[in-house]
Amino acid sequence: MRRLLLAAALAAAAALPASAQQAAGPSTILNVSYDISRELYQAVNTAFVKQWKAKTGQDLTVNQSHAGSSRQARAIIEGLEADVVTFNQVTDVQVLHDKGNLVAADWQKRLPNNASPYYSLPAFLVRAGNPKNIRNWDDLVRDDVKLVFPNPKTSGNARYTYLAAYAFAKEKLGSEEKADAFVRKLFANVPVFDTGGRAATTTFVEREVGDVLITFEAETNGIRDQYPGKFQVVVPEVSLLAEFPVAAVDKVVDKRGSRATATAYLDFLYTPEGQDILAKFHNRVHNPEVVSHYKEQFPPVRLVTVEEAFGGWDRINKEHLASGAKLDQLFEKR
C-alpha cells in the first residue's frame, strides 16, 4: 500500500507544471540588506511576492534584515542565514567569498552590470534655504560647517563618502598629502559618528544635529519628500559611482533549497517593473525606458569610478580599508 501511495505521489508531482514544481522550495527567504533600504525592499517584496504567487501558486514571505552593510556581511560570515544579499558596496559581497566561501568567485558575472541592478552617489542634504551655502565638497571642510554621516568603519554608505571626498581632494589639490589633510578636516567636522545610515539620518533630521547630511542621493531625496519644505538636496559637481551589488548566498540557498526563489528574486530587480520601483525610490537604474521616464528626477553629475580614482576595490582594500591603512590613520588623527 505504501508503495502505491508513493508511486501516486511521484506521478502527481511529475504531472505538475514546472513553475509549480519550482515553488516546492521553502516559503520564506531572507534578504539581508544595507541600513537605509527598508522602504525600498518592502515595495520590491510586495511586487515580487505577487508575481511569484501568480507564477508558481506559492505564498512566499520575503523577510528583511537591515544594518550597516559591513556589519551585515560579518553577521552572515558568523552564521546569519541570508538567502540573498543586497548591499551597497562590492567589498561586502566579496568578503563572503574571501572569508566564508559563501558565495561563488564569479558572483559579479552572474547578473548584468556587475550584479548591480541600480546605483547612486554620495550627495548632500541641507536645511531649507541652504543657510551655509553648500555647493561642493570643499564647502564641507569649512570651520563653520558641521557634518553628519555614519562611521566609515561600519557603514558602506560612509565609506563611499570617504572615498568620494578623497577622490575629489586628490584631483583638485594634486597630492595625497593634501587629500589626507582634507579628509582629516572632513572627519573633524563630524560631531557624532553613528553606526549606520539610518541612524545618521535620525541624528540630522530628528535631533537636528549638523548642517549637512552626507548620504546616498536616493536617501536625500526620500527625506526631502518625507519632510516637505524642511530640506533640500545638493548634488555636487562630481561624485563617486556607488554600485549596489546583489547576490544569492550559495551555501545557504543550496542548504535550504531556495536557489530558484532567490535567483528569481534577484532577476526581478532587472525587470521593467523592478527597475521602475527602484527609480521611484530615487535610485539611478539601467533600463533605458525607465531612465527616460525619470530623467527629470536626476540632475547631471560627473561620476568617477573606483577604478578611475583608486585602481579598483582590491587596491582600496589594501591601501585604504584594511586594518591600520589610510582610513584608520586619518580617522584616528581627526
Please identify what each model-predicted range represents:
Residues 97-171:
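A conserved helix-loop-strand patch within extracytoplasmic ligand-binding domains
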Residues 253-334:
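Extracellular/periplasmic juxtamembrane helices and adjacent flexible linkers that interface
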